[in-house]
Amino acid sequence: MYVLVLSLGDPVSRTFLELHPMPLVETRGDIEVRKYGEIPAVVYKGEPTEFYREDILASLGKYAIFISRHEMSNPRPLFTVHTPGSWPDVSVANPRLASALFRALCKHAYEPFECAFEATHHAPNTSLVSATFIEVGSTEAEWRDKRAVGVLAQALEEALTKEFEGPTPTMAIGDLHYVTISDSVLRGEFDLGHVVPKYINITTNIVENILKKHTISIKKTIIFRKNIKNPIRTEIIELLRAKGIEVTLKG
């Protein structure tokens, strides 16, 4: 069901591999297939955002989890979760998995680390499997910190052993890059899939596309009204309501 993706070009992936040596199962071209407990793990020589062998992921599981570093302009110790997507296309989002990982990260985070749920951003874009990034930020010190990277393993162990029956599958449109509704996810008010950030050109076509790119049907959408101008805001609301999706306006 699950498959881990680790990239040798990524320092967090390398630290994770130091902590958790994984036996080699087979090699497919430049891709190694290893085993993390009972979960297949793909080890790739490049960067996480450059991974291109979705066919290998699809042969091993349905839900891919990328182990990765997090970078930001004003670095601070941070654990993050997000779905990848280089707009206007995106990966398949997994609201249940992403939200479970986020809650587990927050549970196991320790000072000075904080946790954040990020808007959908950067490659790769998937269509056959869901993709979820789980990250440690935001400098070399944190990327190589075995205790910090060990929190990712704790979150994986906790999240992947849970039954994924959860609250309302929800997406958000027009939020900030570091989403402002993460506390609601933490409290279990809903499970969050794609978050369309306010800084992209938001269109009805994008909304139509991301609705199709979730592992479960979206039942609710949170729209940040001040960040989406009319007439496009009204068009998006009408589109969602016509599909029977609950719309909540914020701001």
Swiss-Prot record:
Keyword check for Cytoplasm, yes or no. Answer: no
Which Gene3D superfamilies does the UniProt record give? AF0625-like
Q: Which UniProt keywords apply?
A: Hydrolase, Metal-binding, Zinc
Q: Which GO terms describe its molecular function?
A: D-aminoacyl-tRNA deacylase activity; zinc ion binding
Name the needed cofactors. Zn(2+)
* UniProt entry tagged with the keyword Phosphoprotein: no
* GO terms under biological process: D-amino acid catabolic process
What Enzyme Commission number(s) appear in the record? 3.1.1.96
InterPro entries tied to this protein: Deacylase_DtdA_archaea (IPR018033), DtdA (IPR007508)
First-tier enzyme category under EC: hydrolase
The record's section on Pfam families has: tRNA_deacylase
* Record text on cofactor binding: Binds 2 Zn(2+) ions per subunit.
- How would you summarize the oligomeric state and partners of this protein? Monomer.
Q: Which family does it belong to?
A: Belongs to the DtdA deacylase family.
Biological role stated in the UniProt entry: D-aminoacyl-tRNA deacylase with broad substrate specificity. By recycling D-aminoacyl-tRNA to D-amino acids and free tRNA molecules, this enzyme counteracts the toxicity associated with the formation of D-aminoacyl-tRNA entities in vivo.
What is the protein's name according to its record? D-aminoacyl-tRNA deacylase
